[in-house]
């Protein structure tokens, strides 16, 4: 299996990921875990994989449903300090390619929770007018 697009740079990390905008009935599907913020369905691009292939794979892994891409929504870049144990206090530079997905009319995630490494994550529908902490 190919490695994630995650590169150690001096005392920091370069991370290249994809995110999916999955909207239905005025809500967007987000991911949560044991921390106090939510983030988009998605994950790291694997070396040798295109961003489009990565977002389709990540959506399938996290929702259990195969979806097509509608279009690239935007590119997001951010510097932040990691809070996971292996990345605590490391400066991370992250580039995210965020795609709008074509959501099937009868879409419902196969599972509401999944494992990402050793942490359990869960899917949350959030109203577009709701004020939430995001990552």
Predicted regions and their residues:
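NUDIX/MutT-family hydrolases
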Residues: 98-100, 110-135
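Conserved hydrophobic "DFG−1" position in protein kinase catalytic cores
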Residues: 22-23, 30, 101, 125
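Conserved Nudix-box catalytic region and its N-terminal flanking loop in Nudix hydrolases
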Residues: 24-62
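A structural signal for short, well-ordered beta-strand segments
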Residues: 20, 72, 97-101
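A generic structural micro-feature
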Residues: 12-14, 87-95, 115-120
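Active-site-adjacent beta-strand/loop module that shapes the phosphate/pyrophosphate-binding cleft
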Residues: 80-110
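Acidic, metal-coordinating catalytic segment for phosphate/diphosphate chemistry
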Residues: 1-19, 25, 88-90
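A short coil-to-beta-strand element that immediately follows conserved catalytic motifs
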Residues: 66-75
């Amino acid at each position: 299996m190919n490695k994630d697009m995650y590169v150690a740079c001096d005392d920091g990390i370069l991370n290249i990921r994809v995110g999916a905008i999955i909207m239905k009935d005025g809500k967007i599907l987000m991911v949560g875990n044991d921390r106090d913020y939510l983030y988009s369905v998605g994950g790291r691009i694997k070396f040798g994989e295109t961003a489009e292939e990565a977002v389709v794979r990540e959506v399938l892994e996290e929702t259990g449903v195969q979806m097509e891409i509608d279009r690239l929504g935007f590119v997001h870049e951010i510097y932040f300090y990691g809070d996971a144990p292996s990345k605590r206090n490391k400066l991370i530079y992250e580039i995210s390619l965020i795609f709008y997905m074509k959501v099937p009319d009868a879409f419902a995630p196969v599972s509401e929770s999944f494992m990402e490494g050793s942490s359990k994550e869960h899917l949350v529908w959030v109203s577009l007018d709701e004020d939430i902490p995001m990552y």
